[in-house]
């Protein structure tokens, strides 16, 4: 069409121009405005030219319109791309918005939970603070009480240490049978009474004299001839008749009250008559050595260390046939009652106190060392016969030791080990002395002398060191009982309340 227009344009130009006077369509802008009469007046060439010209104009308008449409389409494509991008961005923003909404909901729930937890925690904190305040106040009170108890225990331990030091000094001085040991013993008891709040019970078998023990040395001072240390040491070293008088240990002498003025009292001081010796010496050798449970010092630790009420019923004076059977002093009986732990059986079976034995059997330190080294090797036997204190694990001793601290417990166990050792020595000494007395003098000479009646022939074979050591041990136990409530309660729980 454009080619036709291009071809028609030169043709129109080549055509002869119309007459000037005629109305040509050159001046006409639009053919539509030309009427039909005017078109009929035109020639063919004019019509062709006007037609070609109108066609060219329309073609150019169409080209412009197509270009415009093309541009619009291009712009439309650009706008569509932008719209797609905006849609994607909007989708992403919507997703982000949803996530933010979920996060806000989660944070709000978490905030609500945090509020609830904080309220619960505050409530728990207030309750815990109140409980801790009460507990701390209670524990502070207990701590104060424990501090007071600790101070009391420390004070008691210091007093016990001082007491042990004084006892060791007294043992080192070694005034065996003299009055100085009794005086030092009285001073120690006064120290214990002033240092400890506990008062020693009456008749607990301790070293100090009491109103419950009628055979204490304060009541028997007039039994000894002189009462001086020289008088106590002289009869034991020389073996004079005065010595045999004071060595008399008949039951009448042990059970007689010291203030009686009857003639039997002077007889008890001089010793039993031969008629009284004969029925007692006709039995077995054990009966000659132990005519009565209160007549020989070796029975002392055996009867002292048994503390059951049944044993007390068996050994009361004037009792059942079991009493007479136990009074024979057989080795089985001695071994049976050798592992007790009470002091109250001493006045029951013996009828006397350790101070009474101290006046009759106490010896000087020189005599103690001489008889201990010459008898049966007592110095070397101390290490072999010493048994550890841990072997004594009976329920009886556990009850006694439950109220003691460690230092007092170890000290008392050492004393008990010493008692066992002295028991072994005491049991071995009379056997050798009885064999010597019966083999050397025959039957009549050994039965008629007061020394053979008690089971001892010569001063070197007498058990004064053993008896003195036993008295020292019992005195220490009594002093320890005054300072320790556990021992004191055990020793004074079963006091001798029968007639002396």
From Swiss-Prot:
Transmembrane segments: none
Pfam family, one: CCDC85
Keyword Coiled coil belongs to the record: yes
Asymmetric dimethylarginine: residues carrying this PTM: 488
Compositional bias segments (type: Basic and acidic residues): 231-254, 383-395
Biased composition (Polar residues): 434-463
InterPro entries (alphabetical): CCDC85 (IPR019359)
Residue ranges, annotated region (Disordered): 1-30, 200-405, 426-465
Coiled-coil residues: 38-104, 132-171, 404-429
The entry's keywords: Cell junction, Coiled coil, Methylation
Annotated Low complexity bias: 1-23, 204-215
UniProt GO cellular component terms: adherens junction
Described purpose of this protein according to its UniProt entry: May play a role in cell-cell adhesion and epithelium development through its interaction with proteins of the beta-catenin family.
Similarity comment text for this entry: Belongs to the CCDC85 family.
PANTHER family documented for this protein: COILED-COIL DOMAIN-CONTAINING PROTEIN 85A (PTHR13546:SF13), RE60986P (PTHR13546)
Protein name according to UniProt: Coiled-coil domain-containing protein 85A
């Amino acid at each position: 069409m454009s080619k036709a227009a291009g071809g028609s344009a030169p043709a129109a130009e080549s055509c002869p121009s119309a007459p000037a006077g005629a109305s040509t369509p050159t001046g006409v802008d639009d053919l539509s405005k030309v009427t039909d009469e005017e078109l009929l007046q035109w020639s063919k060439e004019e019509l062709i030219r006007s037609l070609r010209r109108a066609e060219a104009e329309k073609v150019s308008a169409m080209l412009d319109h197509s270009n415009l449409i093309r541009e619009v389409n291009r712009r439309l494509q650009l706008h569509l791309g932008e719209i797609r991008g905006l849609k994607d961005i909007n989708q992403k923003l919507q997703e982000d918005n949803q996530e933010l909404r979920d996060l806000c909901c989660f944070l709000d729930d978490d905030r609500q939970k945090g509020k609830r937890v904080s309220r619960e925690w505050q409530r728990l904190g207030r309750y815990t603070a109140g409980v801790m305040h009460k507990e701390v106040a209670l524990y502070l009170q207990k701590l104060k009480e424990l501090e007071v108890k600790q101070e009391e225990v420390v004070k008691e331990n210091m007093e016990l240490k001082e007491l042990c030091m004084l006892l060791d000094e007294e043992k080192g001085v070694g005034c065996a049978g003299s009055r100085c040991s009794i005086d030092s013993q009285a001073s120690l008891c006064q120290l214990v009474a002033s240092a400890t709040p506990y008062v020693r019970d009456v008749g607990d078998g301790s070293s100090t004299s009491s109103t419950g023990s009628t055979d204490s040395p304060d009541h028997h001072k007039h039994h000894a001839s002189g009462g001086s240390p020289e008088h106590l040491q002289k009869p034991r070293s020389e073996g004079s008749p005065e010595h045999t008088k004071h060595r008399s240990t008949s039951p009448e002498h042990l059970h007689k009250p010291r203030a009686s003025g009857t003639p039997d009292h002077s007889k008890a001081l001089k010793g039993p008559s031969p008629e009284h010796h004969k029925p007692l010496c006709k039995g077995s050798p054990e009966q000659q050595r132990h005519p009565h449970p209160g007549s020989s010092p070796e029975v002392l630790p055996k009867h002292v260390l048994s503390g059951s009420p049944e044993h007390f019923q068996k050994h009361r004076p004037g009792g059942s046939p079991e009493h007479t059977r136990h009074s024979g002093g057989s080795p089985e009986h001695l071994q049976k009652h050798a592992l007790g732990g009470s002091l109250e059986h001493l006045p029951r079976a013996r009828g006397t106190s350790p101070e009474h034995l101290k006046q009759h059997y106490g010896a000087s330190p020189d005599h103690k060392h001489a008889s201990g080294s010459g008898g049966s090797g007592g110095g070397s036997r101390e290490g072999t016969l010493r048994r550890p204190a841990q072997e004594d694990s009976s329920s009886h001793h556990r009850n006694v030791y439950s109220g003691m601290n460690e230092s007092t417990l170890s000290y008392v166990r050492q004393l008990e080990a010493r008692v066992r050792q002295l028991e072994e020595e005491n049991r071995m000494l009379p056997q050798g002395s009885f064999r010597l007395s019966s083999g050397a003098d025959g039957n009549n000479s050994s039965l008629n002398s007061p020394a053979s009646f008690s089971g001892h022939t010569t001063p070197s074979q007498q058990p004064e060191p053993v008896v003195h050591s036993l008295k020292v041990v019992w005195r220490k136990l009594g002093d320890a009982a005054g300072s320790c409530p556990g021992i004191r309660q055990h020793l004074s729980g079963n006091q001798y309340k029968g007639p002396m």
